[in-house]
């Protein structure tokens, strides 16, 4: 309604520190256009605030991930075709999720899991979650949560090298 638009405009003017006693601001030639400009400006401001909050959260998430899983960074093993390596950052995990079309992006928060990526010639094949309590594969998924043709071979490779994960934990 017109009244709510008027009040909304006054609130927005106050928000941006404008003089609400000035006819210049309170009585513009086209109130709707002015209202829409102020709303757009406020929305942009909120977007920037969210972006900054997300940036700060990403930095904090990276610090926490490094603290929790840093002892495993650099761990990789291969069977001459498949290379399995620890995912070493929250951003790398998010990229794994985007590329593989599955929900691994938030797994950096899983305290008792280690996330690895299996590749062939640098191309992601499957993502592996290993329990840090049992050192067993919890799940191993390819693109869109499907198993790749290398699924069993990847699990066998991880199981064969689980002692390397255990050794890193003992050394810490």
Role assignments for model-derived ranges:
Residues 2-172:
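Glycine-focused motif/segment detector
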């Amino acid at each position: 309604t017109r009244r709510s638009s008027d009040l909304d405009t006054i609130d927005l003017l106050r928000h941006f520190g404008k003089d609400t006693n000035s006819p210049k601001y309170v009585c513009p030639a086209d109130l709707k256009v002015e209202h829409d400009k102020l709303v757009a400006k406020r929305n942009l401001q909120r977007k920037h605030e969210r972006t900054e909050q997300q940036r700060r959260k990403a930095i904090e998430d990276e610090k926490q991930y490094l603290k929790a899983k840093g002892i495993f960074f650099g761990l990789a093993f291969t069977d001459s075709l498949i290379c399995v390596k620890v995912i070493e950052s929250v951003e790398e995990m998010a990229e794994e999720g985007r590329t593989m079309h599955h929900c691994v992006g938030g797994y950096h928060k899983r305290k008792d899991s280690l996330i690895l990526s299996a590749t062939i010639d640098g191309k992601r094949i499957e993502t592996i979650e290993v329990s840090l309590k049992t050192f067993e594969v919890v799940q191993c998924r390819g693109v869109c949560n499907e198993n790749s043709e290398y699924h069993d071979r990847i699990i066998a490779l991880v199981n064969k090298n689980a002692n390397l994960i255990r050794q890193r934990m003992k050394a810490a």
